[in-house]
Amino acid sequence: MTQLYTYIRLLGACLFIISHVQGQNLDSMLHGTGMKSDVDQKKPENGVTLAPEDTLPFLKCYCSGHCPDDAINNTCITNGHCFAIIEEDDQGETTLTSGCMKYEGSDFQCKDSPKAQLRRTIECCRTNLCNQYLQPTLPPVVIGPFFDGSVRWLAVLISMAVCIVAMIVFSSCFCYKHYCKSISSRGRYNRDLEQDEAFIPVGESLKDLIDQSQSSGSGSGLPLLVQRTIAKQIQMVRQVGKGRYGEVWMGKWRGEKVAVKVFFTTEEASWFRETEIYQTVLMRHENILGFIAADIKGTGSWTQLYLITDYHENGSLYDFLKCATLDTRALLKLAYSAACGLCHLHTEIYGTQGKPAIAHRDLKSKNILIKKNGSCCIADLGLAVKFNSDTNEVDIPLNTRVGTRRYMAPEVLDESLSKNHFQPYIMADIYSFGLIIWEMARRCITGGIVEEYQLPYYNMVPSDPSYEDMREVVCVKRLRPIVSNRWNSDECLRAVLKLMSECWAHNPASRLTALRIKKTLAKMVESQDVKI
């Protein structure tokens, strides 16, 4: 690098000298002589040979603009040539000058070739005062090629070449350094992976690891090192879903299927919050999506936020209801299991390792998954809020994301919800849960009749409703999803209708609690002899 800087400095010095030579005027190139007489001409001595310029006769020339200091009547004496020259300056003005030219170099000067950047013409003669009547004319304007052979363009070309070479050198050094760093990181990653694989004994299943963590750990999930190990060893199989937060993939860990939620980097707040909620002490419940691990994967150039959970091949309640119908037992099993999960979220567990009360804030059929046994589990806790009863504080996530407008409670839509108290968040969840029960009930067959699957308010608002659309329907008109007349003729659906109506009441204080919903559905399950 020092050699490069030295070369650039030398180049700068050369360019300075070149520009200095180019900047000299014609007075330094076309040297005239002073006044001389014929007697001043040298005579050859015996045995002495004179130079050619000393044998030439002297001429008297007319001078204008190039006169020596001892010129008389604008004349000068030379043994070379008389000349006249016309030049054009930078402003486009022409000047005609004349004078005497020394013998040395006169042949070269008289053959002066025009330059693209300086228009001029010189004419020479060799008789007394012959240049007084010379009228040289400027050469025509010629737009020459970029490389016209001039020193100035040569300097520019050299400078450009030096800059390009320097850029190539710097780029090569940077790329090589980055490549070495990448190779080093990859090697370190592979070594860590090998060490982590040895950390989890062969034959240990996810269920074994989770059971061990619950019995001997803090109750907040697997140790972080184990989570990172599992995340590194996941094999992605296929994408099964995509949403506003990111993508969901079906992956495998040692042959076991897992769901991998890959968050967009812009949704880091949601990833962090959901990971934090899942790792809350005593959070694990059969009707809450089973959390396995979370990790940030990537190198310096890319980052992936992983959330690894149990995989449920039946998909979401939304997907399930679109293609499947229910009998009363299946309906009650879905509703009751979902209520159990919501009740666990809302309930605070006291003790040395207690669990805070949690409100979901984005309950909808797409955020409830269907397990193999036909029960539900609640997922997507990226917007959840926690309540700390010791400090009486509501822990609200620092997240720009908001819930789904179609499922928002009236107090959320009209912005009357008190954000500093926890109970309003609980009641907003209950409103959303009532809409989910409505979605389930529509797909329940009674008397051979069933409605097609629809989202709540499907016939009242657009497919992607705005706040204003929902506020007009829910808050101003106080409308609720339509109910089929057949519901009143069936004992089970009639009870479900009463339940959902008490869930979506306009006044939050009039709504049922999750515990009351759970107990009511438990009685219905018992009366129908449903096996949970």
Curated annotation (Swiss-Prot):
Glycosylated. The chain crosses the membrane at residues 153-176. Residues 177-532 are cytoplasmic. One of its GO terms (molecular function) is transforming growth factor beta receptor activity, type I. Glycans are attached at N73. It holds the Pfam family Pkinase. Residues 1-23 form the signal peptide. The active site is at D362. It is a single-pass type I membrane protein. InterPro entries: Activin_recp (IPR000472), GS_dom (IPR003605), Kinase-like_dom_sf (IPR011009), Prot_kinase_dom (IPR000719), Protein_kinase_ATP_BS (IPR017441), Ser/Thr_kinase_AS (IPR008271), Snake_toxin-like_sf (IPR045860), TGFB_receptor (IPR000333). Residues 204-233 form the GS domain. Keywords: ATP-binding, Cell membrane, Disulfide bond, Glycoprotein, Kinase, Magnesium, Manganese, Membrane, Metal-binding, Nucleotide-binding, Receptor, Serine/threonine-protein kinase, Signal, Transferase, Transmembrane, Transmembrane helix. Disulfide bonds join C61-C82, C63-C67, C76-C100, C110-C124, C125-C130. Belongs to the protein kinase superfamily. TKL Ser/Thr protein kinase family. TGFB receptor subfamily. Interacts with low affinity with GDF5; positively regulates chondrocyte differentiation. Interacts with BMP4. Interacts with SCUBE3. Interacts with TSC22D1/TSC-22. Interacts with BMP2; the interaction may induce HAMP expression. Interacts with BMP6. Interacts with heterodimers composed of BMP2 and BMP6 in vitro; the interaction may induce HAMP expression. This is Bone morphogenetic protein receptor type-1A.
